[in-house]
UniProtKB/Swiss-Prot annotation:
Species whose genome carries this gene: Lachnospira eligens (strain ATCC 27750 / DSM 3376 / VPI C15-48 / C15-B4) (Eubacterium eligens)
DNA-binding stretch(es), residue numbering of this chain: 278-311
Single GO term (MF): DNA binding
Family: Belongs to the WhiA family.
Function, as annotated: Involved in cell division and chromosome segregation.
Full protein name: Probable cell division protein WhiA
Alphabetized UniProt keyword annotations: Cell cycle, Cell division, DNA-binding
Amino acid sequence: MSFSSEVKEELVKKTDSARHCQIAEFAAFMGMSGNVSETDNGELCLEFVTENELSVEKFSDLLLRIFSIKMDADTNEMVKNGKETIIRITRQSDVAKILQTLKWCDDRFTQIEPVFVDARIVAMDCCKKAFIRGAFMERGSISDPNKFYHYEIVCKYEEDADILMDMLRFFGLDAKVIVRKNSFVVYMKEGNNITDTLNLMGAVVSQMNLYNVMILKGISNDVNRKVNCETANLNKTIEAAVKQIKDIELIRDTVGLDSLSDSLMQVALLRLENPDMSLQGLGELLDPQVGKSGVNHRLRKIGEKADELRQSMGISV
């Protein structure tokens, strides 16, 4: 099962006790995938069309909780059409209740105007969270966090995407909108934003699972950075040792190591005998012992001597 499916499996079991939050979540399902049409006899009909079985389960549950509407009644139906499931509400008393609850009609039931969401329905913070949950359940997805972080909800219209983006930003989340083919996608790519969104939707188990992945990836990245740093330092050490040996060999083969002072010659001989030894190791072999900085100072003096010889011989330094 994908991580996105795991999140939705958790959310389908999440039910707010407050009726106003239930209405907000129901409004999200209708705003994302609902519409108003007319039957052959001219009566109004509400349809909810989805390819998501979990959305069907949650939508049916909300119909029952909010409006006491069951889908086994003769005048309301649920049909399969290929991958799609169509929930059709045709009983006029049920249609009226839903339209009025969603604020899709006036008080006299004379003017029908479906909207993505009426501002009054999501006025409270808890209702905004419920709406975001419903929108994600119906048209959202989250990538496998082991690969990359990406949260999105696909909207039909730009104004709908802007409303949803503003809701997420209300909670301090860095949501943005992009155009993809004929859709408008509300998305986030930062791990902490996604964990916070999972929390506000009520998917706390999925939030913890994502945290665990982020921690493990962070540890892995830290290890890689440390290895890269140590490799870079090792390369510098090797390059320095090669340069030191070339300097010493030049002096030995031209003017002789005995041209050096006793302290420099002692370090030079030890370096030739121990080409891969650290400066600290070389210092411990000296008599008397010398610290790392002392060895580095002597090798630098040897390098200066070698550069002087190169210049006198017309060799580029």
